[in-house]
Amino acid sequence: MVKLRLKRCGRKQRVIYRIVAIDVRSRRDGRALRKVGFYDPIKNQTYSNVPAILYFLEKGAQPTVTVHDISKKAEVFK
């Protein structure tokens, strides 16, 4: 099963999260199937590759609660 979840990147005290499609059994920072966006909580910036997100959702991927909320704010789910 595939999930859309956050992968931690950046440096100490300056975190950035990538939104990735990843297998459920993989670790948080494990190898992702595809990068579909990023989220910067400090600058409150978000970038989402909407066609890629919709593709994975059509294939049965489940977003985590946080990714769902971020996507909702970015108006991926209308």
Swiss-Prot record:
NCBIfam families: S16. GO terms for molecular function: structural constituent of ribosome. InterPro entries: Ribosomal_bS16, Ribosomal_bS16_CS, Ribosomal_bS16_dom_sf. Keywords: Chloroplast, Plastid, Ribonucleoprotein, Ribosomal protein. The gene is rps16. This is Small ribosomal subunit protein bS16c. Gene3D superfamilies: 3.30.1320.10. One of its GO terms (biological process) is translation. It comes from Amborella trichopoda. Belongs to the bacterial ribosomal protein bS16 family. It is found in: Plastid, Chloroplast. GO terms for cellular component: chloroplast; small ribosomal subunit. It comes from the Eukaryota.
